[in-house]
Amino acid sequence: MGCDGGTIPKRHELVKGPKKVEKVDKDAELVAQWNYCTLSQEILRRPIVACELGRLYNKDAVIEFLLDKSAEKALGKAASHIKSIKNVTELKLSDNPAWEGDKGNTKGDKHDDLQRARFICPVVGLEMNGRHRFCFLRCCGCVFSERALKEIKAEVCHTCGAAFQEDDVIMLNGTKEDVDVLKTRMEERRLRAKLEKKTKKPKAAESVSKPDVSEEAPGPSKVKTGKPEEASLDSREKKTNLAPKSTAMNESSSGKAGKPPCGATKRSIADSEESEAYKSLFTTHSSAKRSKEESAHWVTHTSYCF
């Protein structure tokens, strides 16, 4: 309490000053960034994905976040920019052979080495514990250290050989300046994709609205519906049918009665080589002929029926 004798109070005990900003433990922050999911705060487990800003997530947590359509869903800063599963890239990580995991400290009587990491750079061998800068390629998902990217300059991936550009390199858990640069790139990339999608839609609509020119153009039909032999037979039959008509017209115009052409003579179906079932369809067949006694008295017939 003070001021009751025997105590000498100090100034900071009596006068309230500005509160000191609590410093975050750097080691604890690095462990949280590189070992835990940014969205669900659970330990990272395969499959591990990364967004366009370089943050690490569990793929299951991202899928659950996208499927959750409830109004109570908290849209935090960690996942507000993720609109679909295409906005994240599945990472291809290289395991650290020296990593023991939780097996080395099952009893809890050993010190946890925070410098030890689960994954390493496949090119240089640096551990991915936050002490070294790591990046991944958006085109293939391979992860390696920034030192490997600077020391071995190439236009293809160091692990899988896929070609990449400068915009495909995304820094994992970068600084504030790195996040700002990645955010501008992300916005430009999405705007470019929207413009390309809009330009593709009118082209598709024009192709549907405009029919083919070959369909509207007048001309002889090029469609063949049968064999060439059948087409030649049809043309011959048409010629034979047109020939008697032309001769009949010439005779009527000249006023001379001539003999009917040989093709115009009547031919009985009984003389043909067709089957009896086919011949029975005509009135000239024997089954169609009836005597006067068998035929009804009220039915009238013309001369050509029998």
Curated annotation (Swiss-Prot):
- Localization of this protein: Chromosome
* Biological process terms in GO annotation: cellular response to hydroxyurea; mitotic DNA replication termination; regulation of DNA stability
Region described as Disordered: spans on this chain: 193-276
- Single GO molecular-function term? DNA binding
Extract the coiled-coil ranges from the record.
none
Q: Which GO terms describe its cellular component?
A: nucleus; replication fork
Biased segments, Polar residues type: 243-255
Principal subcellular localisation of the protein: nucleus
Keywords from UniProt, A to Z, are: Chromosome, Phosphoprotein
Q: Which InterPro entries match?
A: Rtf2, Rtf2_RING-finger
Q: Does the keyword Phosphoprotein apply?
A: yes
* Subunit structure of this chain's protein: Interacts with DDI2; probably also interacts with DDI1.
So what does this one do? Replication termination factor which is a component of the elongating replisome. Required for ATR pathway signaling upon DNA damage and has a positive activity during DNA replication. Might function to facilitate fork pausing at replication fork barriers like the rDNA. May be globally required to stimulate ATR signaling after the fork stalls or encounters a lesion. Interacts with nascent DNA.
Membership in a protein family: Belongs to the rtf2 family.
Q: What is this protein called?
A: Replication termination factor 2
Q: Which organism is it from?
A: Homo sapiens (Human)
From the UniProt record, report the name of the gene that encodes this protein. RTF2
